[in-house]
Amino acid sequence: MAASLGRLTVLASVPHVTANFAPIWLAKDLGYTAAEGLDVTVEIAGSPKDAVEGVIAGRGDLSFVNIVFSFLAYDRGAPYRPFYAFVRRQNRSFSVPETSPIRSLGELRGKVIGLHYDDPELRAFARAALVGAGVDPERDVVFKPLAGSPLDAPKMAAMIRSGEVAAVWQLDVLSGLMAGEGLPLRSLPAPEIDGLTPSSCLEAMEDALAERPAVFAAFGRAVAKATLFALTNPAAAVRFLWQHHPDAGPAPGEDPAHAFRRELAALEVRLASQRIEGAPDPRWGAITEREAAAWQEFLLSTGAIASRRPPAIYYSNALVDAFNAFDPGEVIDRATSSGP
């Protein structure tokens, strides 16, 4: 049994427990955090913005949000630092229904764009992406939050189907959720952002990372194991999550099989971006200076941030060796033996 490392509070950037971010909860549910000597609490913050502000205010130790939040936080003097690359590819895009005639960002002029997660920082990212494509986000488009919560697939699908919005600024998992509702989406090419990596990261305050490195290293290692488990057996990951968190399962009156297919589809979309194979540094949690520099150049060029800094300020790789200090074979064997 590992020595006790104490408590760690994770502020979840979602309205409720969800398979979209299954490894965060599975790190605890599968016993990986306990084996590290960590007493982990995952508190629902409700939104990415609330999670970030909670960590900055000291109400939690870390959250998992898009790396854009860190750049914008530094720009206002809050040293909120990514230390583990959770999603290795770009996970934000503009999408349209598969049957839509819209094929480019330029064709969004005059359209209403639905917002999947309506946070100021994510709006800033959307505006920057449009500016990069030559679209004026203030004059050429209208933004409108999608109906319900960002996890309420039926309500969001109804709004898109009705034509109330022509496109969506979405998190990758929305594609899986909508596919589960019979509404396949197609991402629009966005050369200015498609190559920017990583996207979602584990992020904490600089001083906390310096004061408790063993704690953050242990949690990152547990998340790496849970991610590998989910990659190996996504269906088992959803089942484990539902067993430990019934509120993540079917809504009252909802067909369980339909809900399972939808949640599995969303998780599989997310997991495709969490693979480390092909990443600039193919180790769990790693971020490179070149990646951080590319993000900074994009955000500066589109006016999203005002100040240039050494790229290394925007991330920490100090714990990457610790994240990867485990036997992947043991995790894979467990996942494989956990049923179809």
Where are these regions (language model features)?
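Predominant activation on well-ordered alpha-helical scaffold segments within soluble catalytic domains
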Residues: W25, F71, R127, G176, ...
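Short linear loop/turn motifs
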Residues: T41, V142-P145, D255-A272, P310-N324
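Secondary-structure end/capping motifs
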Residues: R212-A304
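Conserved C-terminal helix/tail region of periplasmic/extracytoplasmic solute-binding proteins
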Residues: A292-P340
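Extracytoplasmic/periplasmic, Sec-exported soluble proteins
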Residues: H16, W25, E43, S100, ...
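Short, glycine-/small- and polar/acidic-enriched structural segments
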Residues: A2-M156, S162, A166-D172, L188-A190, ...
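Pocket-lining segment of extracytoplasmic ligand-binding domains
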Residues: K155-E254
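Hydrophobic alpha-helix position signal
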Residues: A27, T33, A73, L130, ...
